[in-house]
């Protein structure tokens, strides 16, 4: 299905006033797979709940029905910026003295309104200096990141938020025994928020905006949206906002925006996990019941969009590989029936396996790449196609091929069985998604934002099963007209519209790690019923056996649903045989004597099963996944392909050309270039050369080389993992019946990449023409794995480098605004022969490079010490370990990871016991021993002409590398 399939349920209830045990009446839906309960408070706040007791935790989302489409036209990006500011605290936390702080915050608010009216550059600089000075004084009272500390104390993970066109959503994953504290914190956060730390957080938004200007796919989509939605904010406004508006923010507008939309009758609390609904509702009533509703919410009104009668083409430029994007305007989520048919239409065209375009364009190697989606938002949807050219192919040729496939939707040139197969795959997808608390709760979010009755979402499958081919073709003819689309060519070139937002000078604010609000102290001292940790017992939680030939068989029963995963692991990868990656790509285009390549895709899709064959550096993994009843038939298809694939020299020739073009395209991608630089830094040029084929070697490969490598590998000794609903005996028999094992398979010798040791400082510079630099700082002193180091590593990483409460985030982003993204950690080896390695990363603007690197080096070597921050990190670790549960396939994977290190028991148990007795002095001693005064390889990816090369040379001898050096081709 083209967009995430979601289910949601609602429960409205009245609190019974009599009796000490409150009872609630919920809105439910018969046949709802989530057994959802929905309750509505008197103030309009909705609570969506689904119980899942697999782990003692809850995924929580607080969804506000407001997004960038609701931003004032003169201050776009406001909803997104407000999302950032909602992490800054309230009158009760985030400050040591709100009464003393408030006059300065009021003054800052007024000064920003004055700042917005200034146009003279010198006047603006002078006024911003005043704002900065007052902000610094206010920071002496504020307590940055106290919200994050609160979440750490209660053991929350995944603390974050996001803003889109239609929604702003705040997320936390909390222990089941912390519901009361979570509700207390969130209620105060939403009812009594305070805007503080405004100008430093604005710096983070500047960074986010500047980075977004280099995202070529976003440029193309914005170009298309401007045509499809010429009257609606979907096409007029962007989520982050315009550069001009970000330069002239208004705190007053933000507060007015919050007062209008952040009200209980515009909010839903959506949860999934281990909890009692009655008790949960009682807690929500207790803390959120006082929240005043807004009966007059000002919602968006807009004129209907004009009909598009002829194609509109636009061109955008950027550094990434070329592509073409095509979009049609379609019905939004509020038009449930039409939107759902659009989902089926999207999957008939493209499903990643057997859709029309999958087979006609991708499998047939007519274009370099393709994907499509029916992107449905509440007000409107859009049907999007994206195509990448092959070498020598024009974007216009790609356009014509894609439009031809859409034409087949209109004429009905496809088998109706494809619709039936699509429904079966949607069912499987839903079943898999509902294993996750996050997906379950997000289903509620989407239903609420779209204004649906939960019954319509809960029973969606019943309607989808009735969709006919006629409905599909009618929908395509109505909404995917031959001339009613917008198109964006994304070409390689300098973007004339990029105007980097210059960062104003700011004074680093005080971090005040020694301070703590009374509110935080009360949460820290609150008593909750302890949850005892449960560590996996591999003698009870799984089973081990042997198949023929001594092949190890690992078994875990799926107690949740009927999905089965079969996995075969071979200890050989691209480090041993760099042909394997291309070999498996080649195999995916081939058929067998009894099935064509296209028929294989169709048969697997019809079975609602999927497979993957992939080679990593040290292992090759074969996976088959689907319903238990079909898994054997799917395994037969894959095994037949592995051993009986029919070579095709035409396919191989095209594949080689595509591989070379993909390599050229990789050198255009900032992310791919940085990934290659990191591999070079971590492992060195010898590893790159050994595990990478040259272009000449690729061109010389034959079918016999590639298919022979696969066949040979599959005759070697390996491991088989099974996770499914069958009992062990039946599962073992199924594998033996459908998986071919050679007689006396030869064991494989494990060969793993070893991180290179650093014997002196060195700087590596790799060119990439962008306004942002990516930076890696790496050190390896050759220390080998010792499980007794685990508690120290865990404590140090949590205190210093991971999360928004850690030193790195506070110093690099919160206090100084030097980086949008920064992290650091000491990484543990994955196998005994490898080493511990220290890793640090920064992504920021080129003009901040020197300040960012200097500050990073300072905090790494002179780690700030705070007893209060340490206690928060310690509480977070213990709470997370108490509620962590290793389940499902994770049991088998953890067993293998531990075995690779020579261990047989969970490492978490020792960490849990040791951390309870650790002190800040232990962390300091660990930092002195393991981190301080290391020697590093510094890797920079960026535009060297923007860098302070004199400063960079002080880090160590400078070596200029080419992209060919780091990629190995």
Can you annotate each of these PLM segments?
Residues 188-195, 287-295, 403-413, 639-647, ...:
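A common structural junction motif
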Residues 50, 55-68, 77-79, 95-188, ...:
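M16 family metallopeptidases and their MPP-like homologs
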Residues 1-5:
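Positively charged n-region of N-terminal signal peptides that target proteins for export
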Residues 21-49, 276-317, 322-323, 328, ...:
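Proteolytic maturation boundary segments
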Residues 197-202, 218-219, 223-225, 236-237, ...:
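Hydrophobic, small-residue-rich alpha-helical packing segments that form membrane-like cores
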Residues 9-18:
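Bacterial N-terminal signal peptides
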């Amino acid at each position: 299905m083209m967009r995430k399939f979601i289910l949601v349920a609602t429960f409205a209830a009245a609190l019974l006033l009599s009796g000490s045990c409150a009872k609630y009446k919920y809105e439910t839906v018969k046949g709802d797979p989530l057994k959802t309960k929905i309750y509505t408070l008197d103030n309009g706040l909705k609570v969506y709940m689904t119980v899942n007791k697999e782990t003692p935790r809850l995924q929580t989302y607080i969804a506000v029905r407001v997004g960038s489409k609701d931003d004032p036209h003169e201050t776009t990006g406001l909803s997104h910026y407000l999302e950032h500011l909602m992490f800054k605290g309230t009158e009760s936390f985030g400050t040591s003295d709100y009464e003393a702080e408030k006059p300065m915050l009021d003054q800052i608010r007024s000064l920003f309104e004055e700042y917005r009216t200034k146009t003279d550059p010198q006047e603006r600089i002078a006024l911003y200096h005043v704002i900065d000075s007052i902000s610094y004084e206010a920071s002496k009272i504020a307590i940055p990141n106290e919200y994050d500390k609160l979440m750490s104390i209660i053991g929350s993970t995944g603390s974050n938020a996001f803003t889109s066109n239609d929604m702003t959503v705040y997320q936390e994953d909390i222990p089941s025994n912390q519901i009361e504290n979570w509700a207390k914190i969130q209620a105060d956060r939403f009812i009594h928020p305070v805007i503080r730390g405004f100008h430093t957080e604005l710096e983070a938004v500047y960074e986010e905006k500047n980075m977004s200007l280099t995202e070529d796919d976003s440029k193309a989509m914005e170009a298309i949206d401007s045509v499809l939605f010429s009257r609606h904010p979907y096409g007029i406004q962007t989520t982050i906002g315009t550069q001009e508006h970000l330069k002239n923010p208004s705190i007053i507008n933000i507060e007015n925006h919050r007062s209008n939309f952040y009200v209980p009758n515009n909010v839903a609390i959506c949860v999934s996990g281990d909890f009692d609904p009655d008790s949960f509702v009682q807690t929500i009533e207790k803390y959120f019941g006082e929240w005043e509703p807004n009966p007059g919410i000002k919602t968006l009104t807009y004129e209907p969009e004009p009909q598009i009668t002829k194609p509109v083409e636009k061109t955008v430029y950027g550094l990434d590989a070329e592509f073409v994007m095509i979009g049609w305007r379609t019905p939004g989520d509020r038009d449930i029936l039409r939107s759902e048919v659009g989902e089926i239409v999207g999957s008939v065209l493209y499903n990643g396996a057997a859709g029309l375009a999958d087979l006609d364009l991708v499998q047939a190697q007519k274009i370099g790449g393709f994907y499509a989606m029916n992107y449905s938002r509440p007000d409107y949807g859009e049907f999007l196609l994206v195509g990448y050219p092959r070498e020598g192919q024009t974007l216009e040729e790609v356009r014509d091929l894609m439009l031809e496939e859409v034409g087949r939707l209109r004429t009905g040139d496809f088998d109706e069985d494809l619709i039936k197969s699509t429904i079966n795959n949607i069912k499987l997808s839903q079943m898999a998604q509902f294993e996750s608390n996050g997906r379950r709760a997000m289903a509620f979010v989407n239903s609420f934002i779209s204004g649906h009755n939960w019954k319509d979402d809960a029973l969606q499958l019943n309607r989808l099963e009735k969709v006919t081919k006629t409905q599909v073709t009618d929908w395509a003819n109505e909404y995917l007209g031959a001339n009613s689309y917008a198109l964006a060519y994304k070409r390689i070139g300098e973007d004339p519209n990029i105007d980097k937002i210059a960062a104003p000078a700011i004074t680093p604010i005080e971090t005040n790690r020694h301070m703590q609000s009374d509110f935080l102290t009360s949460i820290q001292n609150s008593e909750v019923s302890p949850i005892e940790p449960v560590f996996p017992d591999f003698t009870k939680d799984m089973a081990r056996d042997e198949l023929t030939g001594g092949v190890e068989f690992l078994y875990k029963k799926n107690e949740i649903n009927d999905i089965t995963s079969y996995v075969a692991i071979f200890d050989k990868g691209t480090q041993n045989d760099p042909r394997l990656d291309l070999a498996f790509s080649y195999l995916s285009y081939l058929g067998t004597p009894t099935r064509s390549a296209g028929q294989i895709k169709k048969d697997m899709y019809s079975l609602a099963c999927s497979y993957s064959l992939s080679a990593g550096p040290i292992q090759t993994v074969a996976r088959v996944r689907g319903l238990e009843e079909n898994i054997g038939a799917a395994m037969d298809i894959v095994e037949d392909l592995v051993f009986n694939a029919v070579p095709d020299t035409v396919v191989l020739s095209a594949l080689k050309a595509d591989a070379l073009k993909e390599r050229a395209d990789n050198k255009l991608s900032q992310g791919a270039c940085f990934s290659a630089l990191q591999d070079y830094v971590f492992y060195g040029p010898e590893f790159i050369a050994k595990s990478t084929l040259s272009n000449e070697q690729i061109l010389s490969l034959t079918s016999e080389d590639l298919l022979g490598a696969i066949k040979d590998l599959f005759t070697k000794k390996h491991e088989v993992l099974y996770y499914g609903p069958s009992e062990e005996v039946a599962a073992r028999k199924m594998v033996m019946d459908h998986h071919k094992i050679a007689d006396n398979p030869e064991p494989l010798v494990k060969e793993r990449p070893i991180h290179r040791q650093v014997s002196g400082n060195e700087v590596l510079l790799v060119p990439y023409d962008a306004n942002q630099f990516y930076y890696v700082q790496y050190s390896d002193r050759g220390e080998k794995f010792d499980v007794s180091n685990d508690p120290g590593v865990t404590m140090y990483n949590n205190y210093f480098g991971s999360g928004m409460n850690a030193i790195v985030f506070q110093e690099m982003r919160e206090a100084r605004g030097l980086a949008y993204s920064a992290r650091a950690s000491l990484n543990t080896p994955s196998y005994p022969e490898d080493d511990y390695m220290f890793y640090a990363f920064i992504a920021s603007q080129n003009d901040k490079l020197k300040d960012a690197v200097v500050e990073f080096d300072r905090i790494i070597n002179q780690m700030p010490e705070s007893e209060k921050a340490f206690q928060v990190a310690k509480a977070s670790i213990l709470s997370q370990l108490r509620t962590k549960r290793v389940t499902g396939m994770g049991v088998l994977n953890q067993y293998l990871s531990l075995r690779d290190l020579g261990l047989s028991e969970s490492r978490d148990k020792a960490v849990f016991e040791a951390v309870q007795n650790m002190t800040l002095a232990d962390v300091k001693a660990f930092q002195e021993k393991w981190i301080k005064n290391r020697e590093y390889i510094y890797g920079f990816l960026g535009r060297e002409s923007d860098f302070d090369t004199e400063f960079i040379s002080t880090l160590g001898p400078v070596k200029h590398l080419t992209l060919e050096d780091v990629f190995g081709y």
